[in-house]
């Protein structure tokens, strides 16, 4: 199945797992996250997001299509995960989350830094 048009680079499954773990760990260890596209968009516009996570299975895709462009404009790293349902679970909500943002990584600081480094390498390879 082809990726939606807003997915600018391929994220390996191992990295996606680390992302779910980082969201959950940040939430559970005194960090701060934003859940959902409205909150995520505001966090990016305010320049307070450390890492933005965008689900690949969002329908319609236009809901999150603006996020990669906005993140690039604000120089905020972003990463894709395959499942909005798992992203919602990692964020601690009962419903799916099309996107989320880590504002303060809390105890997931090292994990978030590692993810950002891997994302930069993936984007460089993909020319994204």
UniProtKB/Swiss-Prot annotation:
Q: What does the UniProt keyword field contain?
A: Cytoplasm, Ribonucleoprotein, Ribosomal protein, RNA-binding, rRNA-binding, tRNA processing
| Location in or out of the cell | Cytoplasm
Lineage: superkingdom: Archaea
* Biological process according to GO: ribosome biogenesis; translation; tRNA 5'-leader removal
Q: Which family does it belong to?
A: Belongs to the eukaryotic ribosomal protein eL8 family.
Q: What does this protein do?
A: Multifunctional RNA-binding protein that recognizes the K-turn motif in ribosomal RNA, the RNA component of RNase P, box H/ACA, box C/D and box C'/D' sRNAs.
The record's section on NCBIfam families has: eL8_ribo (TIGR03677)
Instruction: Describe, as the record does, how this protein assembles with itself and its partners.
Output: Part of the 50S ribosomal subunit. Probably part of the RNase P complex.
The identity of this protein, by name, is: Large ribosomal subunit protein eL8
- Annotated organism of origin: Staphylothermus marinus (strain ATCC 43588 / DSM 3639 / JCM 9404 / F1)
Upper lineage is: Archaea, Thermoproteota, Thermoprotei, Desulfurococcales, Desulfurococcaceae
């Amino acid at each position: 199945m082809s990726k939606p048009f807003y997915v600018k680079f391929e994220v390996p499954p191992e990295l996606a797992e680390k992302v779910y773990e980082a969201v959950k760990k940040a939430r559970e260890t005194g960090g701060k996250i934003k859940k959902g596209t409205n909150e995520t968009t505001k966090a990016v516009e305010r320049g307070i997001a450390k890492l933005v996570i965008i689900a690949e299975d969002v329908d319609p895709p236009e809901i999150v299509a603006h996020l990669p462009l906005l993140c690039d404009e604000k120089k905020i790293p972003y990463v894709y995960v395959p499942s909005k349902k798992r992203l919602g679970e990692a964020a601690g909500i009962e419903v799916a989350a099309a996107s989320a943002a880590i504002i303060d990584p809390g105890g997931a600081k090292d994990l978030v830094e590692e993810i950002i480094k891997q994302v930069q390498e993936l984007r460089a390879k993909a020319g994204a």
